Amino acid sequence: MNKTEKALLQLTGRALFGTPADFEPSAVDWSALYHEASNQALSLLIWDTLSDEERGSVPDDVGIRWEQDSFRHIMNNEQLLYEQEQVIQLLTAASIPCVILKGSSSAANYPQPSLRIMGDIDLLVRPEQQMEAVKALQANGYGDVLDEKHHCHMTLHKDEIAVEVHKEPNGLFLDGNSEILGRIRNYFSDAIDRRQFMDGLPVPSDEHQAIILILHKLEHFTTSGLGLRQLCDWAVFVEKKDG
């Protein structure tokens, strides 16, 4: 592990849990740290936790890009949260209950939820209502399904916003006849009935959320690789539930 990675981990720990960071700001390659934080989808979280001394050590050109990038993420988060609320209201009116997967569901466990960068909107509905939910969205401005044959979700776009309508969580890459897959699907059969609300947001029960996070990590581990943000999602979930 190099100095940049160590500094990034220490800053992440401070942002999430208040643990002290032990490094000399002037010795950090801030350009490399910014790029790595961006690659890990943590640039907003890290920029917010920097002290005045640390920001003063960031080269001007890097600091300008980082600050602009952070502002862009804040605006994108707000836009997604607004659209998410509209989608939830739309599905509720159509008698299609749902829960939020990942995204703001995971962000709710962060000390400052607004600092978790969002990418899209992931909704879990009952399998038998997946197409009904898709049609409800299409009747309200969303386009054609891009991945109709995907094993667990259908993705629709409206302008630059993507909504994934799931019939089951990510990470279930097992053979359709697998006994394990059958057990996992059976485990999630009551996910909608057992949903809870956090600040009005429908989210999975703690037990379901734990398995969803693990399955999501499994998917990343076996495909694109496990990132720091996935570890952060798990760490803050465990910290909040243990606390």
Give the ranges of each region predicted by the language model.
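Conserved NTP-donor binding/palm subdomain of two-metal-ion nucleotidyltransferases/polymerases, i.e.
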Residues: 1-119, 125-243
